[in-house]
Amino acid sequence: MAKTLFEKIWDSHKVSEINGRSLIYVDRHMVHEVTSPQAFDGLRINKRNVRRKDLTFATMDHNVPTTNRKLPIVDQISETQIKTLEKNCQEFGIPLFGLDSPYQGIVHVIGPELGITLPGTTIVCGDSHTSTHGAFGAFALGIGTSDVEHVLATQCLVLDKPKTFEIRVDGKRKNIHAITAKDIILSIIKKIGTAGGNGTVLEYRGQAISDLSMDERRTICNMSIEGGTRAGLIAPDAKTFDYLRGRKYTPKNYDDLVEKWKQALKTDIGAKFDKSFVIDAEQIVPQVSWGTNPAMTADVTESIPEPSEFAKGDSSQEIAAKIGRAHV
């Protein structure tokens, strides 16, 4: 049976299924200082250890000083969270990219830069924009603190299988310098709305997506969450494989894996998506956000819509639009 890329990744990581819910194996668990303290406390209370220390990677992320790191951290909560992660990683034997590590960085940046993120893998992190890793052909999703504890203890996660949603961006951009990846994703969210992807995983396809650099693809997948979806992904190609080659954690048999990925990690011809949306890249122009959510976006050539026009009969949206316009 023909399958989508997401369905292939899901099926290859499904451990079991009970009452319609699936137990999914997690290949990579990224941890940072903000959403992990209570999870480690839960392990202590229940006298559990970390199941796969070798597949768990911690980094200082949210509370890192942007200037002199040798100076004390002024915010007391931030300092406590950083010290707590250091303590927890030492106690549970988890590798940590601390403030003095050359590998420390924003979690969704260092994952690919270090070769931790790989095509066809499942990746979780206690951060809503974990979908960024989907740019590399991974099923990556943000999870809450209770699920962080569950993955630390079991290396698995119980999930309802999302629906599949194809976003196809056909054709080429008129000007690759003027029309950015951010313009593409804002155009999409403007059309489908911030709840358009609820209960789905997006797969971005089409010529305009293939033309994007890996950084641009990360921009697209990062903002999938703003469309209400659980995750977004793009099939890996030569750009993906070249980017990840030779990184610190890239597997030694990488070239062999690439040959397998070329054949396996793509949506089959004839595969059916539950939903589909098509947009013409040539029609996309620079976007301007005028409100308080990503759907409140207009072409740079357009006027800001009236609240009633934007809301289309939804009173809550009309109120939101009025608030949004007040900030312009």
Residue ranges and their predicted role:
Residues M1-R325:
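Fe-S-dependent hydro-lyases/dehydratases of central metabolism
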